[in-house]
A protein has these predicted regions:
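Glycine/proline-rich, positively charged
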Residues: 117-226, 230
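Structured C-terminal cap/extension of enzyme domains
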Residues: 21, 211-389
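Glycine-rich, proline-tolerant flexible connector loops at the mouths of alpha/beta enzymes
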Residues: 81-100
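Conserved, mostly hydrophobic/aromatic
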Residues: 48, 60, 82, 97, ...
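Active-site mouth loops of central-metabolism enzymes
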Residues: 58-66, 112-120, 238
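N-terminal secretory signal peptides and thylakoid transit peptides that target proteins
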Residues: 1-19
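C-terminal segment of N-terminal export signals and the immediately downstream linker at the start
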Residues: 26-58
Length: 389
């Protein structure tokens, strides 16, 4: 354990400069001389929909984390719900979770994901996840990356997930979505099948999504909020503003949210997040979020899906704009490389670069041309750094 060498006030000042969802380059140097907080936050538990699981309102998104010490610190703080996926870090993320919680499995809830394939491939994926996680069951198995209401009501989804439950490989099941969230939640609410929905949800989203979250929660679906920090931009890029705890508290005000899974990468970040459970949203927090929203305007795609179908070449703009968030917000270009393996990013960015005039208009005022130009720069740079297998 790190020694307690500094006071609480200075500690808070230091950690407020760290980014939620992206690793600070000098954080390892800081950690060597930084004392951990002796205080354990007052935990808030909420029920994860009809699963009945009592989860900490602030839980942990593990996607960008590569340090098992962060997981163990979260566990020490009392956080009990962890979100990972088969594809994160090409499986290494699940392996880290499994190793960190070996011997503690009964004290944590693990949510992981499976991608749509034929049953044989999906079954193989689940089996790999079980091995990596060092467990014989998954608490919540999520069908990853839905983007249309039809996918939410897919009979193949129902059949496969039902088999996983019957075989004891998954206790509960659900889906995740980054786009068209409101329409997907409304569709899911019509069915009694889904136990959990993992949804991109933060202070930038519309009243329509908030209402859909309420409808889904009323139907018994446990709502897990991701992307709660709206990209997690670093303090230095926002003129010293560090609104990430305020963004988290804003989401926790919505009692229809069972838990939030902010993406953290450092011990300092998870401590800052956990502290959000014991402090109320203030007027000062509101002012911070207003400044943050002003900073984000024209920078971040909310994945609302409003521009789908507008491109004459059929290029999905959200896939390209997510690249900007990976680089500029998360500061994790490894995610760009992973995205290139799963999508046609290179082909699509080439189409964009050859297009004489972009006809796509963002309803939220995003400068589409400028963002696509940035995405092109980051994609090309990542493609050049990939070493052929």
């Amino acid at each position: 354990m790190l020694s307690n060498t500094i006071g609480r006030r200075r500690f808070i000042k230091i950690i407020s400069s760290t980014l939620l969802g992206a690793a600070a380059p000098n954080i390892l140097k800081v950690r060597s001389s930084l004392g951990r907080s002796e205080k354990t936050p007052t935990l808030e538990y909420r029920t994860l929909g009809k699963t009945g699981l009592k989860v900490t309102a602030v839980s942990m998104g593990v996607m960008n984390c590569s340090d098992p010490a962060v997981l163990l610190r979260a566990f020490d703080l009392g956080i009990n719900f962890y979100d990972t996926a088969d594809c994160y870090m090409k499986g290494r993320n699940e392996e880290m979770v499994g190793k960190a919680f070996e011997g503690k499995r009964q004290k944590v809830f693990i949510q992981t994901k499976v991608h749509a394939h034929d049953e044989k491939k999906m079954r193989a994926s689940v089996e790999r996840s079980l091995r990596r996680l060092r467990t014989d069951y998954i608490d919540v198995l999520v069908w990853h990356g839905h983007s249309s209401p039809e996918e939410v009501s897919d009979p193949n989804l129902f059949e496969f997930m039902s088999k996983m439950k019957k075989e004891g490989k998954a206790r509960f099941t659900g889906f995740s979505t980054h786009s068209h969230m409101a329409s997907l939640l409304r569709e899911a609410a019509k069915s009694s099948f889904h136990d959990v929905a993992l949804v991109s949800y933060n202070f930038t989203h519309s009243k329509d999504l908030k209402e859909a979250v309420a409808l889904a929660a009323k139907s018994g679906i446990g709502i897990v909020a991701m992307k709660t920090q709206a990209g997690g931009y670093k303090k230095e890029k926002m003129g010293g503003l560090s609104p990430h705890q305020a963004a988290l508290k804003y989401i926790l005000m919505d009692q229809n949210v069972s838990c939030a899974v902010p993406g953290v990468t450092t011990i300092e970040q998870i401590e800052e997040c956990a502290a959000a459970m014991e402090v109320s949203f203030s007027k000062g927090n509101l002012n911070e979020l207003k400044q943050y929203q002003s900073f984000l305007r024209g920078r971040i795609c909310t994945m609302c899906g409003g521009c789908i179908g507008e491109c004459a070449y059929g290029v999905p703009r959200s896939d390209l704009l997510r690249v900007v968030m990976y680089h500029d917000g998360y500061q994790n270009d490894g995610l760009i490389g992973e995205a290139m393996e799963k999508t046609e990013l290179l082909q699509n960015i080439k189409l964009c670069s050859e297009c004489p005039s972009c006809s796509v208009v963002c309803r939220r005022g995003l400068d589409m041309k400028a963002q696509i130009k940035l995405a092109q720069e980051f994609i090309v740079r990542s493609s050049e750094s990939i070493v052929p297998g």
